[in-house]
Amino acid sequence: MTRIRRGYIARRRRTKIRLFASTFRGAHSRLTRTITQQKMRALVSTQRDRGRRKRDFRRLWITRINAVTRENRVSYSYSRLIHDLYKKRLLLNRKILAQIAISNRNCLDTISNEILK
């Protein structure tokens, strides 16, 4: 009986997984079973951290806006600024407000003064 040559499908799948894990350290980039386990863990972590990154940036923007608004007035805070923005129907998101607060504080002062009028 003649010898049957194996197909290429499994080898192609494993090389694809190895390319994904080529930057991992130690056995995580060499052994097929640990490569697949680490790939699963890596993909789970990236999906979880995508949502976490959104939360972290939103917290950072809120902190920056709050710091700048409290510098100017004693009783004025982030929550009052956002409330006044909604009352005046000014559509500025927190990312833009934080960039304005860092780069040009005078502009944020004028915005808050116009809102309070």
Curated annotation (Swiss-Prot):
Protein's UniProt name: Large ribosomal subunit protein bL20c
PROSITE patterns per record: RIBOSOMAL_L20 (PS00937)
Domain of life assignment: Eukaryota
Family (UniProt): Belongs to the bacterial ribosomal protein bL20 family.
Organism: Calycanthus floridus var. glaucus (Eastern sweetshrub)
GO terms, biological process: ribosomal large subunit assembly; translation
Keyword entries, A-Z: Chloroplast, Plastid, Ribonucleoprotein, Ribosomal protein, RNA-binding, rRNA-binding
Localization per Swiss-Prot or TrEMBL: Plastid, Chloroplast
Lineage: Eukaryota, Viridiplantae, Streptophyta, Embryophyta, Tracheophyta
GO molecular function: rRNA binding; structural constituent of ribosome
GO cellular component: chloroplast; ribonucleoprotein complex; ribosome
